[in-house]
């Protein structure tokens, strides 16, 4: 038993885990939404318990999924870890596995960001480490190398010249990236790493096949798993707009726009499949997702309905 939990909060956590499983399913009916809202509003312990779900999702850095079919846009891996985290709060032994996992390491990392937060850190060598929303990284410098371990989320690196000429490396679950220049971003997804190079080049070694390597040059983007490289593609400048505290979209499907917003906004943001293909262009302040939703409502034939402060539906007019 967890002595910090009252019986009512323990029951609320059990109910929250049930509702999380329901709302992260493939189909969520209006009746289920209404019942969740009723449950959420009827008791402060329920609101506290749901906040624990949100906190776990924020820390775990869930990657947005199919916004048209998943209420909370969480990947299967994220859903599993959230449920384990709730077990941990309930005092169940199985939750300990979360803290022994790489995600658990991330929860104790040197640098972490919550949802909607971008953080900039100047490292001891003068390099700049920028963490995107819901990200975690450890930094280790020794006499031989400078290393950043990305546990989850996304980081941007601007390297500084090192008097000791130590290599600057980023480690992810899928491989090792060595800076051959000054500016690049790295995003940790469930089963692959996304690398975007803005200046100079980055060398990539695969975790399961270190003999294989790939050089990614400025203006290029690469996805890779632990065992194979994807195709090198031209860099999409919009993908790195967050480093300037903005979100930029150029003729993007509304479904993709909403998937991006869910990374920065707490709660449930649902997009009806009937409007997911509408296109949006614009540049918006990253910290004001309400402004983006207002533009969507004003420029596209959609209706934006606030079920609660933390639940918004986007549907056809």
UniProtKB/Swiss-Prot annotation:
Localization terms from the record: Cell inner membrane
Regions crossing the membrane: 82-98
Induction of the gene: Induced by hydroxyurea.
Keyword line: Cell inner membrane, Cell membrane, Ion transport, Iron, Iron transport, Membrane, Sensory transduction, Transmembrane, Transmembrane helix, Transport
Spans within the Cytoplasmic topological domain: 1-81
Listed InterPro entries: FecR, FecR_N, Ferrdict_sens_TM
Modifications made to the protein after synthesis: Sequentially cleaved starting with cleavage immediately after translation to generate CL(a). CL(a) is then cleaved by an unknown protease in the periplasm to yield CL(b). Finally, CL(b) undergoes intramembrane proteolysis by RseP to produce the N-terminal cytoplasmic fragment CL(c) which is released from the membrane and binds to sigma factor FecI, allowing it to activate transcription of the fecABCDE operon.
Cellular component annotations (GO), alphabetically ordered: plasma membrane
Pfam families given in the database record: DUF4880 (PF16220), FecR (PF04773)
Entry annotated with the keyword DNA-binding: no
Motif Internal twin-arginine motif location, chain numbering: 79-80
GO terms assigned for molecular function: transmembrane signaling receptor activity
Keyword Transcription regulation: no
Coiled-coil residue spans: none
Membrane topology classification: Single-pass membrane protein
GO BP annotations listed: intracellular iron ion homeostasis; iron ion transport; regulation of DNA-templated transcription initiation; signal transduction involved in regulation of gene expression
Disulfide bridge positions per record: none
The protein's assembly and partners: Interacts (via periplasmic C-terminus) with FecA (via periplasmic N-terminus). Interacts (via cytoplasmic N-terminus) with FecI.
Function: Required for transcriptional activation of the fecABCDE operon by sigma factor FecI. Undergoes sequential cleavage to produce an N-terminal cytoplasmic fragment which is released from the membrane and binds to FecI, allowing it to activate transcription of the fecABCDE operon which mediates ferric citrate transport. In the absence of citrate, FecR inactivates FecI.
Protein name as annotated: Ferric citrate uptake sigma factor regulator FecR
Species per Swiss-Prot/TrEMBL record: Escherichia coli (strain K12)
